[in-house]
């Protein structure tokens, strides 16, 4: 229920472009560094190194030691996306894929702001959005669900080193709604089930 903070929605579009930044920020998907480094116009990486890092890092430092001014993300401008409908399309797609969630839509707002504001103003906007989300009902509910799921997987008083049992078959007594649902869960997991109605 949150957006990336600490300037993430403002810096990433500056170093990777709007389309890539939108995809990463709204989905949270990992992208291999080699793929990002090969993207045209990317400024996230100065250099990727295969093999021994130390000699390559020293050589790189020597190469740029005399360069002034050093490039700064602060000075990079964000080009508006080539597709003028990119932000509207992203919002429409998120309305379908992340139905009812506020944060992904607000991510799009922040990335769009990066194309219109300087870095400081963009970070201020991002901070306001983040603060509005972190105290909101949806973020609180999602945090509650997150911790609830983890708590549900931990049974009190059962030692962590308790060996797992291999379940080979299951019997469910009661073929009502609940029994049918339990039966389907086991069948979907490939475990044979005997369903008994008493």
Could you say what each language-model-derived stretch is?
Residues 149, 162-198:
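Phosphate-binding active sites in nucleotide-utilizing proteins
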Residues 1-25:
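CoA-thioester-processing core
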Residues 19-127, 143-162:
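Amphipathic alpha-helical segments at domain termini/boundaries
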Residues 129-140:
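Long amphipathic alpha-helix in the N-terminal Rossmann-like dinucleotide-binding domain
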């Amino acid at each position: 229920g949150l957006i990336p903070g600490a300037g993430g929605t403002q810096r990433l579009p500056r170093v990777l472009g709007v389309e890539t930044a939108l995809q990463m920020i709204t989905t949270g998907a990992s992208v291999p560094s080699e793929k990002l480094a090969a993207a045209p116009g990317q400024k996230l990486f100065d250099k990727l190194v295969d093999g021994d890092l130390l000699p390559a890092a020293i050589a790189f430092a020597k190469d740029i030691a005399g360069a002034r001014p050093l490039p700064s993300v602060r000075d990079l401008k964000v080009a508006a996306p080539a597709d003028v409908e990119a932000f509207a399309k992203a919002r429409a797609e998120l309305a379908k894929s992340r139905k009812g969630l506020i944060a992904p839509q607000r991510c799009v707002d922040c990335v769009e702001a990066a194309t219109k504001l300087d870095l400081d103003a963009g970070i201020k906007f991002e901070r306001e959005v983040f603060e509005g989300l972190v105290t909101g009902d949806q973020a609180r509910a999602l945090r509650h669900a997150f911790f609830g799921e983890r708590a549900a997987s931990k049974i009190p008083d059962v030692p962590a080193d308790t060996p797992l049992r291999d379940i080979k078959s299951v019997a469910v007594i009661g073929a009502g709604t609940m029994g049918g649902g339990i039966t389907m869960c086991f069948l979907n997991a490939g475990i044979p089930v005997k369903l008994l109605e008493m």
